[in-house]
């Protein structure tokens, strides 16, 4: 038997008249721990009798077996328990000295469950199993353990946008409101438009590397409001075409000399 956290709990325990009598999905216990045939003998309305179990499907939310009891026919049926089913249905009027009762609970409400059942001789002890009774010449043992709860599928967390990103400008220049003032060229500190992107989560991907980065204009390129444009023009020197040709005259002597040289002779 695998470890409890890897094994599946039992979803049913019943009787089978023979190894071939159990329905689909049920497993018949045909061998005891000593290796002998686990035929519980007559007395159940059939020529023989075997215990059979069904296992809960992985991830199933159906009921699981939380306890099994073997009682005499003189004992009343315990509250919360049901008679173990028999395959095929027994004939009416057949007496049974021992009866098998099973308690089923929803998987979400159960903390422990039965994971396995084994049969052994009455004088044999099965480690890590609990004896629940005797039928015929066999002792019946069950293995209980903590029931691992089925965890719900993970739900992705909603994406949140920080307040700092919401305050950055995420809109293009053509999307700016017409009533908002445009930054003046003479201002030393550039301003950027505040845009609330709470309603537009996709616009965060339009953010460039320079959005929200302040910059300062060098004083050399600033224009004083009191300065006169005529004072700036007095520093300019106007040159004629002849002055420009004389100052930047280039005769290409080096290039012409290099082009006139004959290629070296090949010996």
Swiss-Prot record:
Pfam families: DUF2464. GO terms for biological process: endosome to lysosome transport via multivesicular body sorting pathway; protein transport; receptor catabolic process; regulation of epidermal growth factor receptor signaling pathway; viral budding; virus maturation. The keyword Protein transport applies. Keywords: Cytoplasm, Endosome, Membrane, Protein transport, SH3-binding, Transport. It is a peripheral membrane protein. Its main location: cytoplasm. A motif (SH3-binding) lies at residues 154-159. It is found in: Cytoplasm; Endosome; Late endosome membrane. Residues 7-146 form the MABP domain. One of its GO terms (molecular function) is SH3 domain binding. Signal peptide: none annotated. Residues 210-259 form the UMA domain. GO terms for cellular component: cytosol; ESCRT I complex; late endosome membrane. Belongs to the MVB12 family. Component of the ESCRT-I complex, a regulator of vesicular trafficking process. Required for the sorting of endocytic ubiquitinated cargos into multivesicular bodies. PANTHER family: MULTIVESICULAR BODY SUBUNIT 12A (PTHR31612:SF2). Component of the ESCRT-I complex (endosomal sorting complex required for transport I). This is Multivesicular body subunit 12A. It comes from Gallus gallus (Chicken). The gene is MVB12A.
